[in-house]
UniProtKB/Swiss-Prot annotation:
It catalyses: a hydroperoxide + [thioredoxin]-dithiol = an alcohol + [thioredoxin]-disulfide + H2O. Pfam families: 1-cysPrx_C (PF10417), AhpC-TSA (PF00578). The active site is a conserved redox-active cysteine residue, the peroxidatic cysteine (C(P)), which makes the nucleophilic attack on the peroxide substrate. The peroxide oxidizes the C(P)-SH to cysteine sulfenic acid (C(P)-SOH), which then reacts with another cysteine residue, the resolving cysteine (C(R)), to form a disulfide bridge. The disulfide is subsequently reduced by an appropriate electron donor to complete the catalytic cycle. In this typical 2-Cys peroxiredoxin, C(R) is provided by the other dimeric subunit to form an intersubunit disulfide. Its main location: cytoplasm. GO terms for biological process: cell redox homeostasis; cellular response to hydrogen peroxide; determination of adult lifespan; heat acclimation; hydrogen peroxide catabolic process; negative regulation of transcription by RNA polymerase II; positive regulation of brood size; regulation of response to oxidative stress. The active site is at 55 (cysteine sulfenic acid (-soh) intermediate). Monomer and homodimer; disulfide-linked. Under nonstress conditions, present in the reduced monomeric form. Forms active hyperoxidized monomers and disulfide-linked homodimers upon oxidation by hydrogen peroxide. Forms active oxidized homodimers in response to the drug metformin. The gene is prdx-2. GO terms for molecular function: thioredoxin peroxidase activity. Disruption phenotype: Reduced size, egg production and brood size. Survival in response to heat and oxidative stress induced by peroxides is comparable to wild-type. RNAi-mediated knockdown increases lifespan in response to the heavy metal arsenite. RNAi-mediated knockdown increases expression of gcs-1 and further increases gcs-1 expression in response to the heavy metal arsenite. RNAi-mediated knockdown increases the expression of isoform a of skn-1 in intestinal nuclei. This is Peroxiredoxin prdx-2.
């Protein structure tokens, strides 16, 4: 059996695969749909398993900075193939003992693996998700896809920067060069117009 993800329905610039599933939100079991967040940016990130080692560092990092994402009209959703019962038990475990503690983001349960499969991150032989991260715009089109192998976590700073960059482009019509951060120079798309940037840099 292949170890690689297959049957992905997730493509840049195309509508993000829709889903509806249970999640743990503020300590309760709640039905969550992607369509609930139309009109907002969505950062959807998958992680392999509850009660592991790299995963809590990522989930806690995103949760602790949820207000920064909220301030730019963005929601963050975490997802794995574990059940909501497993999620809740992990959330209820103190951070100093490897738990998540109080969460400021929904934690989704993809128990039938359909969401992970649709997004192309399912490790079929183990039934767990690779570390996929997807940025979805307010029209629910996919703008960014990153998939890490299991051992390496992701950067909240870089995710926040990417959302800010997509929002800047949509608002101003200019494009963002490598390493762009809010307040730094952008490029006017066009052969002549772009020279303004290149002359300065």
């Amino acid at each position: 059996m292949s170890l690689a993800p297959k049957m992905s329905k997730a493509f840049i610039g195309k509508p993000a695969p829709q889903f509806k599933t249970q999640a743990v939100v503020d300590g309760e079991f709640v039905d969550v749909s992607l369509s609930d967040y139309k009109g907002k940016y969505v950062v959807l990130f998958f992680y392999p398993l509850d009660f592991t080692f790299v995963c809590p560092t990522e989930i806690i990092a995103f949760s602790d900075r949820a207000e920064e994402f909220k301030a730019i009209n963005t929601v963050v959703l975490a997802a794995s193939t574990d059940s909501v019962f497993s999620h809740l038990a992990w959330i209820n475990q103190p951070r100093k003992h490897g738990g998540l503690g109080e969460m400021n983001i929904p934690v989704l349960a993809d128990t039938n693996h359909q969401i992970s499969r649709d997004y192309g991150v399912l490790k079929e032989d183990e039934g767990i998700a690779f570390r996929g991260l997807f940025i979805i715009d307010p029209s629910q089109n996919l703008r960014q896809i990153t998939i890490n192998d299991l051992p390496v976590g992701r950067s909240v700073d870089e995710t926040l920067r990417l959302v800010q960059a997509f929002q800047f482009v949509e608002k101003h019509g200019e494009v963002c060069p490598a390493g762009w951060t809010p307040g730094s120079d952008t490029i006017k798309p066009g052969v002549k117009e772009s020279q303004e940037y290149f002359k300065k840099h």
